Amino acid sequence: MIKIAAAGGGTGGHLYPLLAILETLAKRVDVKVLFFAVKGKIDERVVRKDHPEFETVSIDVRGLLRPLHHPKNLWRTLKIGIATIEVKKHLKRFKPDLVVLTGGYISGVVGLAAKDLGIPIFVHEQNVVPGLAVKVLSQYAKKVFVSFERTRNYLREWQDKIVVTGCPVRETEKEAPLKDFVLVLGGSLGSEAINELMEKVYPELQETQFVHSTGSDDWTKRLSAFPNVTALTYIDPMGAYWKKAIASISRAGASTIAEMMYYGVPGILIPWESSAESHQLENALEAERLGYGIVIRENEASPRKIIESIDKVVKKGKIEKMKENPASKISEEILGEIM
């Protein structure tokens, strides 16, 4: 039995790769998991639903605002300190053999608490440009797993710890009830901009079938009016739909790009320009460089440009699916270090 403490939440981009790692580890060895979730965020809801066997602890913490000298960060820093004390109490009680972290502010809290208690730390960075938590925790980690080779350039001091693995993807046996459609995603919370844009595109492409994850019941009702659109408020499991998609339109969050690359689906990427450290833009440009997508800046996105790009990616056809899920390599590395 291996006891694992884990954190990586606030958004689906941090959460789903972490669940992929934990689920893969659980297939190989007996595990007991203590999961630290951000109170009121997606990880709290999804983990309790998908993994009731995990012990899930909700922590009331928020990340630091940018720029870092923002006046509200004084209060947030105090809350981070209080949260770290709370996390330490749980870690002392649970006595984990290791900690697995995938970024986000909750990872910073759990990672620093684990460091103080001498618990081995393993970190995964999904984005091309590492976030603040991963930059800080890399110095204490036994291994730093990264999705892209280029990420090494941002963690030069810790080259001996870095393992390029790709970004883990959750597996599923389920399959969507449709096939040969363009998958439209706005991220785990939906995207108003993508929803509004596609509402103008759908009447022009009535021969093309779309599945659109809207992020809200109102948008689901609104977009369901188009006969060529299957509108869903939330898609779960995502893999069931990626398997059957012929192309995609999405933001450029790390887990979305990971699924796109894993299932070999060419995509149109509209990065969210306000993402921290320009994560999404850098992710999108790297995916485009590797031949997986077309990048359209949000301020340049128009119905006509989307229609032209859909034609290009559909004609490109599906790319060969990855032979191995990065979660497998990460699991092997972790088990090799602790067993």
Curated annotation (Swiss-Prot):
Gene Ontology cellular component terms for the protein in this record: plasma membrane
Its catalytic activity?
Answer: di-trans,octa-cis-undecaprenyl diphospho-N-acetyl-alpha-D-muramoyl-L-alanyl-D-glutamyl-meso-2,6-diaminopimeloyl-D-alanyl-D-alanine + UDP-N-acetyl-alpha-D-glucosamine = di-trans,octa-cis-undecaprenyl diphospho-[N-acetyl-alpha-D-glucosaminyl-(1->4)]-N-acetyl-alpha-D-muramoyl-L-alanyl-D-glutamyl-meso-2,6-diaminopimeloyl-D-alanyl-D-alanine + UDP + H(+)
Q: Report disulfide bridges, numbered on this chain.
A: none
Pathway as given in its UniProt record: Cell wall biogenesis; peptidoglycan biosynthesis
What the entry lists under CDD domains is as follows: GT28_MurG
Q: What is its main location?
A: membrane
Q: Where does UDP-N-acetyl-alpha-D-glucosamine bind?
A: T11, G12, G13, N127, R170, S188, I235, Q280
Q: Where in the cell is it found?
A: Cell inner membrane
Q: Which Pfam families match?
A: Glyco_tran_28_C, Glyco_transf_28
Q: Which UniProt keywords apply?
A: Cell cycle, Cell division, Cell inner membrane, Cell membrane, Cell shape, Cell wall biogenesis/degradation, Glycosyltransferase, Membrane, Peptidoglycan synthesis, Transferase
Topology term for the membrane = Peripheral membrane protein
**One example of a Gene Ontology biological process annotation:** cell division
Query: EC annotation?
Result: 2.4.1.227
Q: Which domain of life is it from?
A: Bacteria
MF annotations from Gene Ontology: UDP-N-acetyl-D-glucosamine:N-acetylmuramoyl-L-alanyl-D-glutamyl-meso-2,6-diaminopimelyl-D-alanyl-D-alanine-diphosphoundecaprenol 4-beta-N-acetylglucosaminlytransferase activity; undecaprenyldiphospho-muramoylpentapeptide beta-N-acetylglucosaminyltransferase activity
Gene3D superfamilies named in the record: Glycogen Phosphorylase B
Q: What does this protein do?
A: Cell wall formation. Catalyzes the transfer of a GlcNAc subunit on undecaprenyl-pyrophosphoryl-MurNAc-pentapeptide (lipid intermediate I) to form undecaprenyl-pyrophosphoryl-MurNAc-(pentapeptide)GlcNAc (lipid intermediate II).
Instruction: Tell me the protein family, please.
Output: Belongs to the glycosyltransferase 28 family. MurG subfamily.
Protein name per Swiss-Prot or TrEMBL? UDP-N-acetylglucosamine--N-acetylmuramyl-(pentapeptide) pyrophosphoryl-undecaprenol N-acetylglucosamine transferase
Taxonomically, what lineage is the organism?
Answer: Bacteria, Thermotogati, Thermotogota, Thermotogae, Thermotogales
Task: State the gene name recorded for this protein.
Answer: murG
